[in-house]
């Protein structure tokens, strides 16, 4: 049973601390810390993609405040695999925290190097690749790995032996027993379990999905059938990060005498990195530039492109709008959607499919009748299998929203793990592991989300986002007041409204606001309560905003962004 930590019971004992910077009660920005005495090791540093209401924001990363404050303790960053929600925050981390060494699988290491090169002020000291047999040791920690099956090659779970017990972080995984060399290493998992797993930090993304997930082999067979029967060009879109599937699709295409055309930056980058490190064996002659596809018969072309989520600027959407410079869709084309819409993207994907349909193309989507996509995350029976193999003393669900975490708690109960031995946490909440027992502590680290705009990250962006949301919803209202050198208001304040309401249709209200603002400001000036011009200006702006806000809310039920400009001549 997980108990509350009582310092009086552990005088002279040093706890192993476990916490999440991000990745708990959410899907994205995965980042976890394990700390003992004078050492901190980090597992993953991901990004979370911004929702549509976060206007102008490219992504969200965890706060690194705890690491900045404890810089001398930071010893290493370990990466489970190369997906964006696990490595996308690394360049921003390297700008703020001195990381002595990053340990990563081959493809993740290559992707990180490329990211760092795009961020000139990110300082990378050292990056070391690891595999199934690697072991690393710090003063207090011993770390090794086990291979897992996921939608990207070189994916791993991480085992950390600490002075207070053994912690296993699952990484992202699934069981696909037809995956060959990329199959989850059950034998290694059993060996790790024999050491005793005291805390298992398990992903929970697909905890609500019953049964076992479909094998990728079924997906490949269905895609192969479509490719074989297609008489024209085949345009296939999937997640550019799903390198395992992309590799198989390329092999299927080559076996059907089709050249490969890569469209979209992330697709091009991921394929070329995979080729460079030997994960894809594709001859350069089998890849054609988009401007050259016209030189080949349509039946000999496969276009692999981005845009499976209906992204506006992605290659497939550009084609659907008839705006692509090199690819014009025609009725003989076949479109394969080898993906599912992520929650929040359903409308964008439906709109994309409607636009594609206008060209008369054949469209194949993933469905229960035709499987063209399988998730890379463990479903209920796969989670049960892993929990039975690991059989941890304590479980901390991660990598999922709260309802997913609660569901894996129920699954754990069915596997013999008691509810009181499962910790449903929040980001920033610190757990203590002492003598192989887990405790709730009162310690909290800062886990506020940090927003990214272009390549810049700042806590101040949260305030800017709020302003943008107000602008998009209620518009902007500006008040310009001109004073003479004796603080007398010259004329009537000028009012400007944008996106709030039509000024021409609201002349009486605009007149009322202008005169009320003038009277209110004059009463402030006449009170003579202020010792400095700065104090007076601050108070004038405050009462001006209050006055305008009152009238607009009362008459228009709007709450615009109010800007006041005070000028003295």
From Swiss-Prot:
Superkingdom of the organism of origin: Bacteria
Disulphides: none
Principal location: cytoplasm
Localization, UniProt: Cytoplasm
InterPro entries tied to this protein: Metallo-B-lactamas (IPR001279), RibonucZ/Hydroxyglut_hydro (IPR036866), RMMBL (IPR011108), RNase_J (IPR004613), RNase_J_2 (IPR042173), RNase_J_b_CASP (IPR055132), RNase_J_bac (IPR030854), RNase_J_C (IPR041636)
E.C. numbers: 3.1.-.-
CDD domains: RNaseJ_MBL-fold
Residues reported to bind Zn(2+) 2: 85-86, 172, 399
Pfam entry (one): RNase_J_C
Cellular-component GO terms for this entry: cytoplasm
PROSITE patterns: UPF0036
Residues that hold substrate according to the record: 373-377
GO biological process: rRNA processing
Cofactor needs: Zn(2+)
Chain sites annotated for binding Zn(2+) 1: 81, 83, 150, 172
An annotated Gene Ontology molecular function: RNA binding
EC top class named in words: hydrolase
Record's keyword terms, sorted: Cytoplasm, Endonuclease, Exonuclease, Hydrolase, Metal-binding, Nuclease, RNA-binding, rRNA processing, Zinc
Keyword flag Membrane: no
Protein task: An RNase that has 5'-3' exonuclease and possibly endoonuclease activity. Involved in maturation of rRNA and in some organisms also mRNA maturation and/or decay.
Self-association state and partner proteins as the record states: Homodimer, may be a subunit of the RNA degradosome.
Family: Belongs to the metallo-beta-lactamase superfamily. RNA-metabolizing metallo-beta-lactamase-like family. Bacterial RNase J subfamily.
NCBIfam families: MG423
Protein name per the record: Ribonuclease J
Organism: Mycoplasma genitalium (strain ATCC 33530 / DSM 19775 / NCTC 10195 / G37)
